[in-house]
């Protein structure tokens, strides 16, 4: 018969590499910034191992795979190797890796333990027990196949001879080649015989094979006469034998006597140049396949998420009973369901986690989802259910309409939790769970704000004290101490010198005048705006005297405590867009003025770097879930009066990327639309650059009755009779407030959906009236909602209306230009949003407007600090007040956060405890550790 056709592994592997190169190019085009990653871990420094690795690195480079060669010394222990493997398992830029064998270490290392530490989804060498088990079971699409057997199969397929029904003989049973080759041929429908060192009559067994794969490691063991005529022969051997004709005195031969075998076989692989090049090509193919699987798993699209079914009961159980009736899914599972990588999530137990900002970097090329803001009409003191509506809406969009959806809400302060308000995490069957975690410490963010804020406060008073009690020289020497005879400025001090126009870096070269300017902030105590904070309601800290200890040498001053969430640091964090931006904002925070009227910042105090360290974890959003299993970001909780009252930009941005272009992110703005929504647009959206798609405006029958002239509503007291009996006239009269808030929302060019939050005392006629009037006066739609009693199903109509509204044309626009004078910006808000005739700047406010403009802060947006109980400055005026002049008694600056806040009336920044605080009902069961009485 004619000599066998040569299966040239070099040529075939070159074709495979060319195909892989094209695939990698396409992947990079489809996903900008993405590159398949391969890592090769070497223990020791064997020459042969380095040679093999270099071949793989070169192949990866040609294809476009980012390959990394990790070298560990011979002193490496088994635990150190496994630790490194664990880090590669969690590295999302590495899609496949292998451990080069043998392990060359002076320590005893269990190779099996090391190999099995590799995550199966990254086991591109196919050597883990899981990969072997799946191959043995025939799960070829759910495992990686060892590269040499995989290459052998490709060579066999290259012949064009069908494998199915053929008798295949595999000589050798190693874990790397022989055993997996048997399984691979078996699941390609061959009848397979495996031979080994104990096989009797090996020549007879070999002679039965239509397909023969030899991997024994013994030179030319299989003779040509053993081979069945016309067989396909795949020789995996690489052996060195003496040859005087070769310059190095040896030659390479396979496990088959090639010259004899090629006279009987129909196809045969040469050695070298047969199987060897295919092994490397298959490693590259598996790496590209792993990268594709990674992209498939984390590509934009519908989440594979498991929702929780609610067990609705009547009469309605308490909020806490409802919360505890639904077991949250493990938060790590939820994180995976929504497309977060393990290294992007820091678990805080089973029900809460922090999400790293690296997720935003990874997803930066993904289009954003639809952005929805939930706001409300001017509320009663009881609140109208914005948080409950936010949760109900996302449950409807996710668990019922199967959309990717995220809620982004503020973190509540602990002060009101133990004071008059009680817990807050939505309500009824629309809650964030577990509510105990939501309302208490969560992940410690507010404690971090408190520590950072009070560090600034301590720095202010300490600096005043030291400047009052030391000479310029002594002060300078302590600020720039001599270490081993050398004085050196810190980085933050060099930045201060540059701001002062002193272009020097050597402390010894400063003049006396420069030392004075550098060392003295010369803070005017009367101008200090920075207060200490505490996350507890404590009325007796509203005004205090500090510095009364003898050690302070009589340097006392009057000060106060605010509640922690009133801190500018909280507002700054919520408007931060990155870690670098947060560092800059913290440095810009103005805490006082000097006696010359110059602003003194946290950067001047030298404390901004330390603040960033304290806040490095607080910048990461907190991941929780709703009762029905949809994801929630809980992050930041600034006041809605002296601050902007919105959750963080960072949480919104990460959520918008995670949901993808067809998904929804629903966030809530504090208080009514005239306050929280206006600040959401003019401050938060201005800084984030995000454009909202829909406004959801929450209204209730009881609130409209109040605005229509109903009796006073008081928290803690039963509702008057007018609120629980049908009164269409009162509802229609009070609709004026809802109409005005619809107009306010539409002023920004965004479609408005009115959510009529229904209570059991409301009648259908009242609810229908509100919906009809809303549509007649500009709302895109208005729907009745029963999500408190029914969960997501009760907000289904609302969710569908939001979907339609998100597709409607919109033209988002801000209300004012930042370049306008401060007074004009205030006037625009007062007239257009509140309906005032004009504003009146009282002397202190006029003075502050001039000072801040002179200091360079006049171009900041305006954050109005006004009562939330009326469109006017008078909380007793309901409906739509007219003919009033809005008095501005003062203007203050949150320069780090990035806004000026005019004060309309008096704002309390430290709540007090009532006669009977909520803490009377709160306790812990010592046996179950269950929190009772929180709400």
Swiss-Prot record:
Predominant place of localization: cytoplasm
Subcellular location: Cytoplasm
Annotated region described as Formyltetrahydrofolate synthetase domain, given as residue ranges: 310-935
GO biological process, alphabetically ordered: L-histidine biosynthetic process; methionine biosynthetic process; purine nucleotide biosynthetic process; tetrahydrofolate interconversion
Region (Methylenetetrahydrofolate dehydrogenase and methenyltetrahydrofolate cyclohydrolase (D/C) domain): 2-291
Active-site residues per Swiss-Prot or TrEMBL entry: 56
Documented EC number(s): 1.5.1.5, 3.5.4.9, 6.3.4.3
Catalytic activity: (6R)-5,10-methylene-5,6,7,8-tetrahydrofolate + NADP(+) = (6R)-5,10-methenyltetrahydrofolate + NADPH; (6R)-5,10-methenyltetrahydrofolate + H2O = (6R)-10-formyltetrahydrofolate + H(+); (6S)-5,6,7,8-tetrahydrofolate + formate + ATP = (6R)-10-formyltetrahydrofolate + ADP + phosphate
Gene Ontology cellular component terms for the protein in this record: cytosol
Phosphoserine sites (modified residues): 318, 413, 490
Residues the entry annotates as binding substrate: 52-56, 99-101, 272-276
Residues recorded as bearing N-acetylmethionine in the entry: 1
Family: In the N-terminal section; belongs to the tetrahydrofolate dehydrogenase/cyclohydrolase family.
Assembly behavior: Homodimer.
Job description of the protein: Trifunctional enzyme that catalyzes the interconversion of three forms of one-carbon-substituted tetrahydrofolate: (6R)-5,10-methylene-5,6,7,8-tetrahydrofolate, 5,10-methenyltetrahydrofolate and (6S)-10-formyltetrahydrofolate. These derivatives of tetrahydrofolate are differentially required in nucleotide and amino acid biosynthesis, (6S)-10-formyltetrahydrofolate being required for purine biosynthesis while (6R)-5,10-methylene-5,6,7,8-tetrahydrofolate is used for serine and methionine biosynthesis for instance.
Protein name per its UniProtKB record: C-1-tetrahydrofolate synthase, cytoplasmic
Gene expressing this chain: MTHFD1
């Amino acid at each position: 018969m004619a000599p066998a056709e040569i299966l040239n592994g070099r040529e075939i592997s070159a074709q495979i590499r060319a195909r892989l190169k094209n695939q990698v190019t396409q992947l990079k085009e489809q996903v900008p910034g993405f590159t398949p990653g391969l890592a090769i871990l070497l223990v020791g420094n064997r020459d042969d191992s380095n040679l093999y690795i270099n071949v793989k690195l070169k192949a990866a480079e040609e294809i476009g795979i980012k390959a990394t060669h990790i070298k560990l010394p011979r002193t490496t222990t088994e635990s150190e190797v496994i630790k490194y493997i664990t880090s590669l398992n969690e590295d999302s830029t590495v899609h496949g890796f292998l451990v080069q064998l043998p392990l060359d270490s002076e320590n005893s290392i269990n190779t099996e333990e090391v190999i099995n530490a590799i995550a199966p989804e990254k086991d591109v060498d196919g050597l883990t027990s899981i990969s072997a088990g799946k191959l043995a079971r025939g799960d070829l699409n759910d495992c990686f196949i060892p590269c040499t057997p995989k290459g052998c199969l490709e060579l066999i397929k290259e012949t064009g001879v069908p494998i199915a029904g053929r008798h295949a003989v595999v000589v050798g049973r190693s874990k790397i080649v022989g055993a997996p080759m048997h399984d691979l041929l078996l699941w390609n429908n061959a009848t397979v015989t495996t031979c080994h060192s104990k096989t009797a009559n090996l020549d007879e067994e070999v002679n039965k094979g239509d397909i023969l794969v030899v991997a024994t490691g013994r030179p030319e063991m299989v003779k040509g006469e053993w081979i069945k005529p016309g067989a396909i022969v795949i020789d995996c051997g690489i052996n060195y034998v003496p040859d005087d004709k070769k310059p190095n005195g040896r030659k390479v031969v396979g496990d088959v006597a090639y010259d004899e075998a090629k006279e009987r076989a129909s196809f045969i692989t040469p050695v070298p140049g047969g199987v060897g090049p295919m092994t490397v090509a298959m490693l590259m193919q598996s790496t590209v396949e792993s990268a594709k699987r990674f992209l498939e798993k984390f590509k934009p699209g519908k989440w594979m998420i498991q929702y929780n079914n609610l067990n609705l009961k009547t009469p309605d159980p308490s909020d806490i009973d409802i919360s505890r009736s639904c077991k949250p899914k493990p938060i790590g599972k939820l994180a995976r369901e929504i497309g977060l990588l393990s290294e992007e999530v820091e678990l805080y137990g089973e029900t809460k986690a922090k999400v790293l900002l690296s997720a935003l970097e990874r997803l930066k090329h993904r289009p954003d989802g639809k952005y929805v803001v939930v706001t409300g009409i001017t509320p009663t003191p009881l609140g109208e259910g914005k948080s409950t509506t936010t949760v109900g809406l996302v449950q409807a969009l996710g668990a019922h309409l199967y959309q990717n959806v995220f809620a982004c809400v503020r973190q509540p302060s602990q002060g009101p939790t133990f004071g008059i308000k009680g817990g807050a995490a939505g309500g009824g069957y629309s809650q964030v769970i577990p509510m105990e975690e939501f309302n208490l410490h969560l992940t410690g963010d507010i404690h971090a704000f408190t520590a950072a804020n009070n560090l600034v406060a301590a720095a202010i008073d300490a600096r005043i004290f030291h400047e009052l009690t030391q000479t310029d020289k002594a002060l300078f020497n302590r600020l720039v101490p001599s270490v081993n005879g050398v004085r050196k400025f810190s980085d933050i001090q060099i930045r201060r010198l540059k701001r002062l126009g002193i272009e020097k870096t050597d402390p010894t070269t400063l003049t006396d005048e420069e030392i004075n300017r550098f060392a003295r902030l010369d803070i005017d105590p009367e101008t200090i705006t920075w207060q200490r904070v505490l996350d507890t309601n404590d009325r007796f800290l509203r005004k205090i005297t500090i510095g009364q200890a003898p050690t302070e040498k009589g340097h006392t001053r009057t000060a106060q405590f605010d509640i922690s969430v009133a801190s500018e640091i909280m507002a700054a964090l919520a408007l931060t867009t990155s870690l670098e931006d947060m560092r800059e904002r913290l440095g810009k925070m103005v805490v006082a003025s000097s006696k010359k009227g110059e602003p003194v910042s946290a950067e001047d105090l030298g404390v901004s770097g330390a603040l960033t360290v304290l806040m490095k974890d607080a910048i990461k959003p907190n991941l929780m879930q709703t009762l029905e299993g949809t994801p929630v970001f809980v992050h930041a909780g600034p006041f809605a009066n002296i601050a902007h009252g919105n959750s963080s930009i960072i949480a919104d941005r990460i959520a918008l990327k995670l949901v993808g272009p067809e998904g929804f992110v629903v966030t809530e703005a504090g208080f009514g639309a005239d306050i929280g929504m206006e600040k959401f647009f003019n401050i938060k959206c201005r800084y984030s650059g995000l454009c909202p798609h829909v406004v959801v405006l929450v209204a209730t029958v009881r609130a409209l009755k109040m605005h229509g002239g109903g009796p006073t509503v008081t928290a803690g007291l039963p509702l008057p009779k007018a609120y629980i009996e049908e009164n269409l006239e009162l509802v229609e009269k009070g609709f004026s407030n809802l109409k005005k808030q619809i107009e306010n929302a539409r002023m920004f060019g965004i479609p408005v959906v009115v959510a009529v939050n229904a209570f059991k005392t409301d009648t259908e006629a009242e609810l229908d009236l509100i919906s009809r009037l809303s549509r007649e006066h500009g709302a895109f739609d208005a729907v009745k909602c029963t999500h408190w009693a029914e969960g997501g199903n009760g907000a289904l109509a609302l969710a569908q209306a939001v979907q339609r509204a998100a597709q409607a044309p919109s033209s988002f626009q801000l209300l004012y230009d930042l370049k306008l004078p401060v007074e004009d910006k205030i006037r625009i808000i007062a007239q257009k949003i509140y309906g005032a005739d004009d504003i009146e700047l009282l002397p202190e406010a006029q003075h502050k407007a001039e000072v801040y403009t002179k200091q360079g802060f006049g171009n900041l947006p305006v954050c109005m600090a006004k009562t939330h109980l009326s469109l006017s400055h008078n909380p007793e005026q309901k409906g739509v007040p007219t003919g009033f002049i809005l008095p501005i008694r003062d203007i203050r600056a949150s320069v780090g956060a990035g806004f000026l806040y005019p004060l309309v009336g008096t704002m309390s920044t430290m709540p007090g405890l009532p006669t009977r605080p909520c803490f009377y009902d709160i306790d812990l069961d010592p046996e179950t550790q269950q929190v009772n009485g929180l709400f």
